[in-house]
């Protein structure tokens, strides 16, 4: 058996706001927008061919799977458009070794790095 794809699940306050952020800033594609019980929704975003983000409301996770509601994982994205993304997202933050960090509208931080491969 082998792994064929990866989805990182992020638990956020507002699924739509965070989805809009990734669609606007990283040109993510919405690949699923599905209902959950009690009127909640989940959105899956294709970031690259190898990575999908699954956005879930924190309130839903707290109610149905509280054992997994923990800290946000540290995500590192690689790009060939580093300078353009730094101009868009860097907000004056320092660059270090070809990386910079940026925040989404809820204050979750991510790292962007120059693609060196």
Residue ranges of model-derived segments:
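Vicinal oxygen chelate
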Residues: 10, 33, 86-117
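Eukaryotic phosphotyrosine signaling hubs
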Residues: 5-7, 70-74
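Core segments of cupin and vicinal oxygen chelate
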Residues: 2, 9-52
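Short, charged/polar surface micro-motifs in flexible loops or helix N-caps
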Residues: 48-52, 60-61, 81-83
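Short amphipathic alpha-helices within nucleic acid-binding modules
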Residues: 21, 83-88
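Helix N-cap motif at beta-to-alpha junctions
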Residues: 14-15, 80-82
């Amino acid at each position: 058996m082998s792994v064929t794809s990866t989805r990182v699940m992020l638990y956020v306050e507002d699924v739509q706001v965070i989805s809009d952020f990734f669609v606007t800033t990283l040109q993510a594609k919405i690949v699923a927008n599905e209902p959950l019980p009690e009127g909640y929704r989940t959105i899956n975003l294709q970031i690259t061919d190898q990575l999908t983000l699954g956005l879930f409301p924190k309130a839903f996770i707290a109610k149905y799977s509280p054992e997994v509601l923990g800290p946000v994982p540290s995500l590192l994205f690689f790009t060939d458009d580093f300078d353009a993304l730094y101009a868009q997202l860097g907000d004056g933050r320092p660059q270090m070794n070809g990386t910079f960090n940026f925040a989404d509208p809820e204050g979750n931080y991510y790292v962007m790095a120059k693609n060196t491969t």
